[in-house]
């Protein structure tokens, strides 16, 4: 009888673990109160957008370490500033369990284009319960931003450093609050704590009025004769579920929301899982090694330009995305905003803890209104998905994500008849819901370099001298048009094909 009980308990535990892998309880990161009149109200605020041309160069970012009257950081003020300065700013941070600092993360995703300097300010605000989240919203967190700004208004701060494009708006404010948040259930900080999230002040309800649909304004103040507005912010807990600084991945996730990116999960349902920072990839290695940006995310940030394939060709020597900005785009000709993006993901840098490695093929049906919607979690829903991965193992469950990269076993192709098939959401030129632009012979060699044949009549990579091609346009691997023939050795793109100049 005891053995039967043990087997029963084991099976129940197994079922529980399986369910947990698929349906980890999660709430959205954007939890203000949606409203229909948002489009009208937003006329006075910068519109939501993903990325922008100001995410390059050296940029200063203000980070506020907010201690509560009833809840302090693990160390005193000096120790806290020292610890978080290390987590945010140390270049090439290699102190276990960290795989790098926050600076390192974004420097790596941008291929060195985005060099962040985080300026830390320590403040003390009211008791934590004043700002607590409920199961429905984060409306109380607006008071945390208000109280933080009230303290900062008494300090000599050069706010112009945080207005990256000179429009009078502080691009975003990061708040790290003391203790745990409410996002870890029984392992969290309890009822009177804050759910880590990102939002805008002007999307918060004005709780001082009796009108349930009266929304507040952002915070505007004067500094050194200039008027600045703080609207976009994110708030993240100091301590993670394990009691350490495993909130690192959550910081990268919420900060990326500030850049305009949505969640790719829907409540408990995940769609790209550990392969993407904006799904469950922020929790890779318990949050210390969040997944790197996908090629699509880097493209939106203007850190990468995918190469569109139109004619039959053979692509070889594709480096890991974490090392070089090389990715390929295959478009639905009859619906240009639907496309596949092919990228090589290897266990390098912040991709070290991905569930697998190989060629990942994203299927993206891009709709800017969904990506930038105030109504969070609209990109992927149970009835419609706009950002997914073709699973090479033909298994969409997140627990099977280790087999999503190509090649998988004997499956090294994505065609109209493969499993999975090269499906579309919108009809192609032949009236079908199939791409009809097959990828064959997908492979990764012992050096981690990927290759594939695009369409059946593929052309091998050419090795040429400078004089072979003269009048055609040359592009580098970032998609930049060269003024003429390249003057140095390397790999270039000519007429949609990779060309090696020796």
Outline where the language-model segments fall.
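Fold-level signature of zinc-dependent metallopeptidase catalytic domains
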Residues: 43-83, 133
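Residue-level detector of functionally pivotal "anchor" positions at catalytic/ligand-binding pockets or at interdomain
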Residues: 454-476
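C-terminal tail/sorting-segment detector
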Residues: 491-502
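Hydrophobic h-region of N-terminal signal peptides that target proteins for export
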Residues: 12-20
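Post-HExxH zinc-binding segment in Zn-dependent metallohydrolases
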Residues: 271-309
